[in-house]
């Protein structure tokens, strides 16, 4: 496997990928993502509903954008090492049924690739891809304990609400 240090020499590509392709490769990143941001990990375990994701993908609702380091390949036509993703859903909003909204499910960039513009470029690609699908408004959330809101402010997004969470299980 060829290797390249992340950073300026890396060639990061952004693309839409099918669920089955991206999900299989994303397992390691998903666990790392969960370890980094999830609250109540001792009570609520990561258990991805693969069937539901596949159903949403089959219906054309799910959109997966991946970020890959093209310098790290296993073989000649390998698209590169998966270093990040954005999973979103394209749906009419329940209050605005005539308009498509892009709703972020999750997004993640491997920590080694967070310096520079990788996150900004990922969301620029997401914006373009969603717009091409007819989306008129994008919605996402950030964790307060891992706040990356400055990326969205830079991209012209507006902070519009706060959400609250409370564990009420046993």
Summary of predicted features, one role per range:
Residues 10-28:
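A short beta-loop-alpha structural element at the N-terminal edge
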Residues 24-27, 31-53:
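Conserved GNAT-fold acetyl-CoA-binding loop/helix
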Residues 44-64, 69, 86-97:
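A conserved beta-strand-loop-helix scaffold within acyl/acetyltransferase catalytic domains
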Residues 72-85, 102:
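Glycine-rich phosphate/pyrophosphate-binding loop shared by adenosine-nucleotide-utilizing enzymes
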Residues 141-142, 158-169:
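Conserved catalytic-core motifs of GNAT/GCN5-like acyltransferases
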């Amino acid at each position: 496997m060829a290797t390249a240090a992340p950073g300026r020499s890396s060639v990061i590509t952004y693309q839409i990928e099918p669920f089955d392709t991206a999900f299989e490769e994303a397992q390691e990143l998903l666990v790392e993502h969960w370890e980094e941001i999830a609250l109540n990990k001792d009570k609520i375990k990561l258990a991805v509903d693969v069937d539901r994701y596949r159903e949403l993908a089959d219906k054309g609702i799910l959109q997966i954008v991946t970020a890959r380091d093209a310098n790290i390949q296993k073989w000649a036509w390998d698209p590169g090492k998966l270093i990040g993703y954005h999973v979103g859903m394209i749906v009419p909003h329940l209050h605005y049924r005539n308009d498509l909204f892009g709703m972020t499910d999750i997004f993640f960039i491997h920590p080694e690739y967070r310096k520079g513009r990788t996150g900004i470029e990922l969301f620029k690609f997401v914006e373009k891809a969603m717009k091409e699908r007819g989306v008129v408004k994008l919605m996402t959330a950030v964790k307060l304990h891992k706040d990356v809101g400055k990326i969205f402010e830079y991209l012209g997004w507006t902070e519009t609400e706060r959400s609250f969470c409370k564990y009420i299980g046993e």
